[in-house]
Amino acid sequence: GNSGARESTYTITIERMPLPENPVKTQISCFSWTDAIARGPEMTALRDGVRGKDKLDVPIKFIWNYAGNTIINQHSDINKTHDILQDESKCEMIVVIDNFMTSSAKYADIVLPDLMTVEQEDIIPNDYAGNMGYLIFLQPVTAPKFERKPIYWIMSEVAKRLGPDIHQKFTEGRTQAQWLQYLYAKMLEKDPQLPSYDELKKMGIYKRKDPNGHFVAYKKFRENQEANP
């Protein structure tokens, strides 16, 4: 056995978009979403691992799927999943946001086409399993094609239709480019060794080696089990 955690790594400071607290505390496992569509009110904490409640009150009626194929080809028993989704009296609305017409997107009632990373500015950090931290300043190498829009634009437009107060709370009055600069300024506050925003944009890639040489999982526990049980 193991801890169930992913392999770890050395990473450079990254600041992500702030997320409000989710008011819905009831949870199910990612894998059991088809059960929640087909027999939601029958699912209980004891039998199905429902968290935050003894049982589900209602089934899933709406799916918002962003950049993933969980709907069909990354789920088990595709034929059963297909049959569940074909009954529109169960899950009544599926929205998919993606770059391509994936297997999951074909089941959507609404498809919102997103931009690819090579079509917009962004900053991404290294992922995992390495001793070199880095930041990549993505810059568009081609213009957006057809009617595709950035995910921030899409969500801003959704927020706008929910009301001016929701739109202001979501965007905080910033464009996508302004958010990128705002978040990077917060990164600089935490990590003054980073280059300036304009310097990073010019460099394209910023690298920094792990100052400890390499990452050791549960290092404190390994060094002193009694002090770090």
Q: Can you annotate each of these PLM segments?
A:
Residues 59-64, 130-140:
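Short acidic (Asp/Glu) and glycine-rich catalytic loops that position anionic groups and cofactors
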Residues 52, 127, 134, 192-195:
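Short, functionally important structural connectors and interaction interfaces within domains
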